[in-house]
């Protein structure tokens, strides 16, 4: 056996088995890393929850403050709402009234136009009646000059024609059985006969 220190150290080191220890140390380091990661995640989760709870607390505080203000001004808000409803109702009534006024104005304008048309027709009818009366007067004067006189019975309304000739006087009753054309020819024939007798 050599007494050299170097050889002694080598033989001593050769007797140690460090591979299992190295593996154990590596496993310990992995576990520590996992624990550290888990703690960091837990911390992040706790911080997130804390932020969420803080935000909820802030919102709840604001809501409570808003509720207090609303409770204090609820009566005023109801009055404003009631006034707004009344304004809306009045505006609606005004709109309906304006539409009715426009409709009535349109109807009035149409009635004025119809009245004007009726007046024009009445004036035209009066002119026509006047013209017819004038024409009838001319016809009666003409027939009278020929010896024809038209008479109407007051009690019955029947009409008759009295024909005056130099030698005779004839009366012809006018009936609806015969046409005006028939009577016209008949009267002219009488005139011709009276002329022939002359």
Curated annotation (Swiss-Prot):
Keywords, in A-Z order: Cell cycle, Cell division, Centromere, Chromosome, Coiled coil, Cytoplasm, Cytoskeleton, Kinetochore, Meiosis, Mitosis, Nucleus
Presence of keyword Nucleus: yes
GO BP terms: attachment of spindle microtubules to kinetochore; cell division; chromosome segregation; meiotic centromere clustering; mitotic sister chromatid segregation; sister chromatid biorientation; spindle attachment to meiosis I kinetochore
GO CC annotation: chromosome, centromeric region; condensed chromosome, centromeric region; cytosol; kinetochore; Ndc80 complex; nucleus; spindle pole body
Pfam families: Spc24
Subcellular location: Nucleus; Chromosome, Centromere, Kinetochore; Cytoplasm, Cytoskeleton, Microtubule organizing center, Spindle pole body
Protein name as annotated: Kinetochore protein spc24
Organism: Schizosaccharomyces pombe (strain 972 / ATCC 24843) (Fission yeast)
Nucleotide-binding listed as a keyword: no
Family matches, as PANTHER family: KINETOCHORE PROTEIN SPC24, PTHR22142
Coiled coil residues, start to end: 51-130
Purpose: Acts as a component of the NMS (Ndc80-MIND-Spc7) super complex which has a role in kinetochore function during late meiotic prophase and throughout the mitotic cell cycle. Acts as a component of the essential kinetochore-associated NDC80 complex, which is required for chromosome segregation and spindle checkpoint activity.
Gene: spc24
Family matches, as InterPro entries: Ndc80_Spc24, Spc24_Fungi_globular_sf
Assembly description: Component of the NDC80 complex, which consists of ndc80, nuf2, spc24 and spc25. Can self-associate. Component of the NMS super complex which consists of mis12, mis13, mis14, ndc80, nnf1, nuf2, sos7, spc7, spc24 and spc25.
Family statement drawn from the similarity comment of this UniProt entry: Belongs to the SPC24 family.
